[in-house]
Amino acid sequence: MKPAIFLMLFVAMFLISEGEGFKPKDAPQERSVFSPVVQSCPRCHRRDHFGKCRKLDPCPD
């Protein structure tokens, strides 16, 4: 086989293994620290420094 075929196979395998970067833009987004759109937490929850919603105890009304 020609070396170019091996190179193309390697690139194709790399792209498949790195599939996280090739999601369509309209796909539901995973939680991202760098995401400019921050969804609000439910009532009695606050966002911690990891970006996750945590339930407050006790709940302030």
UniProtKB/Swiss-Prot annotation:
Lineage: superkingdom: Eukaryota
Signal peptide segment: 1-21
Positions of modified residues (Hydroxyproline): P36
Principal location listed in the UniProt entry: secreted
Protein's cellular compartments: Secreted; Nematocyst
Propiece residues: 22-31
Family under the similarity heading: Belongs to the Hau1a/HC18/HC19 family.
Function recorded in the entry: Toxin that is lethal to crab. Does not produce the typical symptoms associated with sodium channel toxins in crabs, suggesting that it likely does not act on sodium channels.
Extra information: A synonymy between H.magnifica and R.crispa is controversial.
Name of protein: U-stichotoxin-Hcr1a
